[in-house]
């Protein structure tokens, strides 16, 4: 497909999306719920087709030499399809955010003012190897009254296509425009460049992928962007941490799934914790098969690898973690401010004052206490799914669910009211 063809294709998709968004903006909540539940049923009915398509994508990924972490992100199986289905049903069952009254007040002038949620319009989602993003993004945009244009990576091309077909089945059954959820039907990378320039047709871009993709989108987009560049998540084991809680959380935060953005990439251990318990957290990680890149006294633990300066502030997305000893919560905070990506940080402590200091003095999108960073997920937050984790400070932060995909407008009522 040459450049002219891609430009025309994307323009046509944009025009159709804008028309669908105008209709979705006032669609009844019951019809959106019906579409999502029908899409969930279609996903189950098409599961064999989806798995067959995923098999082709996995073969393509293996030929391209994708890393184990990327192959894990790409892979679908029966359990992951069930997870997608449950996510669709969960989003369907949530309150509809469109039209919700955020605030309401009266003015001495006699005006009654309401601030109510309204859809953004058209959302563009650009993602790499995770085919489940097709379902998550489609569902959340539909729930929030937005049309969406999906541009999946070449690795997940067939899987995304099969999932997209199920979503459109749901739209048809509910009598909603199928153009509400469109997928870019080409692997041509020129389509990404076109999306980033489509200010007339797209209201916001959400990139889901690695540092290269997100950095490209942030650098070149003329359309506003919700994004996080990297998930450099920290776990800090405080001197007042409960040992057994700390052992459970650290192992889960690193090893449950290493290829997701909520995976812990750096372990900070209070010197007081080390004095009480020794290097047990490091030993647990080593026994689990994690490569621990350790600094200072932790590098003396047998089996560790000496850390290099570039290991701190690095997103490994693998069975690798950086580790160092710090002299208390303030030193941990200083380290996170220097090396973190404003994604997710967790403190392990039984000391309320220390936890509060950690929460107040850090400004990452998600801060946790005695919990695994792997909970940094819209589904785990009760959103049903997420379209991404936003780490910026404008509009949306943290998991971006249906509510975060809305803006607002003011409804002002008077009674022949005039301004003096």
Swiss-Prot record:
GO MF entry, a single one: glutamate-5-semialdehyde dehydrogenase activity
Cross-referenced CDD domains: ALDH_F18-19_ProA-GPR
Associated pathway: Amino-acid biosynthesis; L-proline biosynthesis; L-glutamate 5-semialdehyde from L-glutamate: step 2/2
GO biological process: L-proline biosynthetic process
EC number: 1.2.1.41
Subcellular localization, as worded in the UniProt entry: Cytoplasm
Main location: cytoplasm
Principal EC category: oxidoreductase
Presence of keyword Methyltransferase: no
UniProt catalytic activity: L-glutamate 5-semialdehyde + phosphate + NADP(+) = L-glutamyl 5-phosphate + NADPH + H(+)
InterPro entries listed in its UniProt record: Ald_DH/histidinol_DH, Ald_DH_C, Ald_DH_N, Aldehyde_DH_dom, G-glutamylP_reductase_CS, Glu-5-SA_DH, GPR_dom
Pfam annotation, one family: Aldedh
GO CC annotations, alphabetized: cytoplasm
Keyword field: Amino-acid biosynthesis, Cytoplasm, NADP, Oxidoreductase, Proline biosynthesis
NCBIfam families associated with the record: PRK00197.1 (NF001221), proA (TIGR00407)
Role this protein plays: Catalyzes the NADPH-dependent reduction of L-glutamate 5-phosphate into L-glutamate 5-semialdehyde and phosphate. The product spontaneously undergoes cyclization to form 1-pyrroline-5-carboxylate.
Family: Belongs to the gamma-glutamyl phosphate reductase family.
Protein name, UniProt field: Gamma-glutamyl phosphate reductase
Protein source organism: Cereibacter sphaeroides (strain KD131 / KCTC 12085) (Rhodobacter sphaeroides)
């Amino acid at each position: 497909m040459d450049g002219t063809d891609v430009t025309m294709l994307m323009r046509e998709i944009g025009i159709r999306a804008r028309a669908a968004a105008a209709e979705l903006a006032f669609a009844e909540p019951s019809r959106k719920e019906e579409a999502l539940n029908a899409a969930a049923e279609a996903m189950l009915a098409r599961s064999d087709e989806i798995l067959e398509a995923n098999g082709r994508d996995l073969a393509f990924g293996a030929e391209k030499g994708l890393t184990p972490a990327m192959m894990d992100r790409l892979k679908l199986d029966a359990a992951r399809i069930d997870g997608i289905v449950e996510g669709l049903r969960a989003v369907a069952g949530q309150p509809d955010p469109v039209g919700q009254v955020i605030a309401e007040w009266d003015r001495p002038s006699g005006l009654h003012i309401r601030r109510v949620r309204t859809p953004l319009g058209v959302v563009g989602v650009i993602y790499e190897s995770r085919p489940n993003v097709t379902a998550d993004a489609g569902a959340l945009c539909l729930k929030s009254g937005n049309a969406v244009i999906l541009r999946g990576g070449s690795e997940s091309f067939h899987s995304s296509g099969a999932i997209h077909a199920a979503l459109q089945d749901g739209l048809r059954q509910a009598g909603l425009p199928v153009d509400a959820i469109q997928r870019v039907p080409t692997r041509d990378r020129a389509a990404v460049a076109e999306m980033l320039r489509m200010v007339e047709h797209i209201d916001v871009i959400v990139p889901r992928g690695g540092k290269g993709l997100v950095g490209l989108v942030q650098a070149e987009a003329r359309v506003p962007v919700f994004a996080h560049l990297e998930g450099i998540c920290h776990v800090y084991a405080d001197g007042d941490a409960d040992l057994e809680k700390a052992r459970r959380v650290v192992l889960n935060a690193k090893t449950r799934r290493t290829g997701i953005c909520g995976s812990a990439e750096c372990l900070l251990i209070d010197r007081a914790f080390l004095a009480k318990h020794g290097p047990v957290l490091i030993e647990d990680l080593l026994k689990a098969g994690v490569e621990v890149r350790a600094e200072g006294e932790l590098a003396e633990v047998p089996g560790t690898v000496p850390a290099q300066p570039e290991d701190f502030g690095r997103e490994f997305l693998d069975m690798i973690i950086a580790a160092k000893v710090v002299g208390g919560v303030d030193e941990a905070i200083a380290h996170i401010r220097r090396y973190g990506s404003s994604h997710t940080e967790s403190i392990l402590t039984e000391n309320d004052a220390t936890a509060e200091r950690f929460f107040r003095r850090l400004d990452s999108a998600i801060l946790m206490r005695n919990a695994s960073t792997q909970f940094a997920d819209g589904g785990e937050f009760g959103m049903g799914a997420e379209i991404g984790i936003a780490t910026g400070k404008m509009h949306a932060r943290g998991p971006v669910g249906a509510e975060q995909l809305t803006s607002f407008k003011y409804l002002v009522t008077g009674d022949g009211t005039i301004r003096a």
